[in-house]
Amino acid sequence: MRPVYFLSDFGLEDPYVAVVKAVLAERAPGPAVVDLAHALPPQDLRRAAYALFEALPYLPEGAVVLAVVDPGVGTARRAVAALGRWTYVGPDNGLFTLAWLLDPPRRAFLLEPPRPRPKAALPGWAPGEATFHGRDVFAPAAAHLALGLPPEGLGPEVPVETLARLPLALTEGPEGEVLTFDRFGNAITTLLRAPVGGFVEVGGRRVPVRRTFGEVPEGAPVAYLGSAGLLEVAVNRGSAREALGLKEGMPVRLL
């Protein structure tokens, strides 16, 4: 049995996370289900892709990564399982782009699972099947794989080259872009270097590169190599997003 690591933008105010975990528990009662994140910004694929990139190196190899950030739910976008050192289940919308830089998938399958049925329902009532694929499509597939069952039982195999990817690239520089922001307002960039003592330019500002936040005065901007190995821009005890007016996709340049 393999553990399942579950990431979504469902939040915790509604029962969506619990319902998905209930389906997992019913179909695969043995494997552990570990929450990666559920308070991601709704429908933000770049933020979710970064969260998976940040977490993946610390997950046990062979684990099932169930990720549901799915703006196109119910449309023609595909539902997939992809197999590498880890196993990925989710929408084929680029969500796994950065994770697959670390772990390129070797095989991929379209998902055609049976849909879970509710244990109680009003007479003549049936749940909608187009808006909750986390429950109806991805959870059954993740449970199947967590039990070690063959992926061929999920649906037809497809070439891994056809899997969707976001137009993102990590680079040594000198130019990159703001990839996303964490909850503190720190800007995570696509740059893989942060030469201490140098500077970066972003949002029309020249920002010093240091090892950590406390090496600049409170309220001052600073760039540094973040915990996931990407250059980040922060404001010591503040929000770089707000204080510097930064936005996703904004150019960043090593000076």
From Swiss-Prot:
User: What InterPro entries has UniProt attached to this entry?
Assistant: SAM_HAT_C, SAM_HAT_N, SAM_OH_AdoTrfase, SAM_OH_AdoTrfase_C_sf, SAM_OH_AdoTrfase_N_sf
Q: Does the keyword ATP-binding apply?
A: no
The yes or no answer to whether the keyword Kinase is present is no
| Binding-site residues, adenosine | D9, D70, N186, V235
- Reactions the enzyme catalyzes: (R)-S-adenosyl-L-methionine + H2O = adenosine + L-methionine + H(+)
Q: Could you give the subunit structure recorded for this chain?
A: Homotrimer.
Under which name does UniProt file this protein?
Answer: (R)-S-adenosyl-L-methionine hydrolase
Query: What is the protein's species of origin?
Result: Thermus thermophilus (strain ATCC 27634 / DSM 579 / HB8)
Lineage, uppermost ranks:
Bacteria, Thermotogati, Deinococcota, Deinococci, Thermales
